[in-house]
A protein has these predicted regions:
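Class I SAM-dependent methyltransferase SAM/SAH-binding core
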Residues: 45-86
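Conserved class I S-adenosyl-L-methionine
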Residues: 1-33, 47-51, 67, 128-154, 200
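A C-terminal cap/extension of S-adenosyl-L-methionine-dependent methyltransferases
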Residues: 188-242
Length: 242
């Protein structure tokens, strides 16, 4: 197993990793009053899948063995060790909610995946896409990493970066909306990690005195356009036309 995957797994347990998921769960706002069928495509360590499996029927699709071997499994969900081939085998209109977080940047068949995600989503269902945001990555490189050269490179016409998962091709929310077409209505856009990833003072992040006010700040700023534009991630929620 590569050390980078293991280090990434450890990172998501840190306060700055947990806050990412705390924001997502708040923004998704999935009610536990009704049991929903949820698909998490590109589930990674299955943190999101496991969270919702406590009250819902969840299928987690993840082809990377290194990642799913380190998955969270406190609750019961179905793990499918596959990718788009499994997606194509799912009957249409199967899921109430489809989740695809930080996946499309790393694939060459973005449009094909989106076609399949739309297909398996029930009419009236919700599609949740989390994506890297170019402006946020520029801030992160220039401020947190003290690497203005990389920040300059990100502002070039070629918005491609190397990562542990291969090339990361950052795309815009407008591109995503265009890919999905008229069948999917954009209902909301949130920012994630506008502030908490800019400080290298990690020691303070283990305290409630930092964590709770920072989470409140991130939550408030996530709906404000000025901060969505510079957040490290954007979270787009679409509704399939009934």
């Amino acid at each position: 197993m590569s050390g980078s995957i293991e280090n990434y797994r450890k990172m998501v347990e840190q306060p700055w990793g947990r806050m990412f998921y705390d924001q997502i769960f708040t923004q998704l706002d999935i009610s536990n009053d009704k049991r929903s069928k949820i698909l998490d495509f590109g589930a990674g360590f299955c943190i999101t899948a496991d969270h919702y499996a406590a009250h819902h029927d969840v299928t987690a699709v993840e082809p990377n063995e290194e990642m799913y071997s380190l998955r969270v499994s406190e609750n019961d969900y179905t793990l499918v060790a596959d990718g788009i081939d499994h997606l194509k085998s799912i009957p249409e209109n199967s899921f109430d909610i489809v989740i695809c977080h930080n996946v499309l940047e790393y694939t060459d068949d973005k449009e094909e995946i989106l076609v399949q995600l739309k297909r398996v989503l029930k009419p009236g269902g919700k599609l949740s896409v989390v994506k890297h945001n170019l402006c946020g990555r520029v801030f992160g490189s220039a401020v947190l990493a003290d690497d203005p050269k990389t920040a300059l490179d990100l502002l070039s016409d070629d918005n491609t970066e190397d990562s542990m998962f291969g090339n990361r091709n950052v795309y815009s929310g407008e591109e995503l909306t265009a890919y999905l077409g008229k069948e999917m209505k954009l209902e909301n856009v949130f920012g994630i990690r506008a502030f908490f990833g800019l400080s290298s003072n990690n020691e303070i992040k283990y305290t409630d005195e930092w964590y709770l006010p920072m989470l409140e700040l991130e939550t408030k700023a996530s709906t404000m356009d000025e901060f969505r534009k510079v957040a490290f991630f954007n979270h787009l929620l679409f509704r399939k036309e009934a």
